Amino acid sequence: MSQAQDDLRDLERLAVELAQLAGDRIIASLGTALAVKYKKLSREEEAEAEFRDPVSEIDSAVEAVLRERLAERYPTHAIIGEEEGGGDLPPGDYTWVIDPVDGTANFVNGFPIFAASIGLVHKGDPIVGAVWCSTSHALRPGV
C-alpha cells in the first residue's frame, strides 16, 4: 500500500470516528429538553418565512467537539460547519465539511430520520466522508 493510500485510510478512519462520536452525542441527548434557535434569514427570506432552519443546542455542541478534534489533529486544515460557518482559517488545500445534525427539524420534532455527516475536500474535490444514520446507527464511510 502506498503512503497516499495509507494517508487516505487515516483520514477515512478519522471521519468515521468523528461521525460515530456525533452519533453517540446525539443519541445521549434523545429524550431531553432541547434549546432550539432559528437561523437568521435575509430580509427577503424573513418576510416570507415562518420558523425554519432550526438549530438545537446539540447541533452547536456536537459541531464544537468535532471542530476541536479536527483542529487538534490537523491544525492547518480549514473547517466549514453547518452552524458556525467557515471559522477563522481561510480555505486551504484541505477543508473539512461537517453537518453535526443533518435533519435538525426532524431531530427537534422527534422524527427519527436525521444523520451526522462529515467530509474532507482536497483542492475542491471530495476525498473522504462518513455519515452516521439515526434509524440504523449505521456508519457509511467513503473514500
Give the location of each predicted region.
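DPxDG-like acidic metal-binding loop motif
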Residues: 90-143
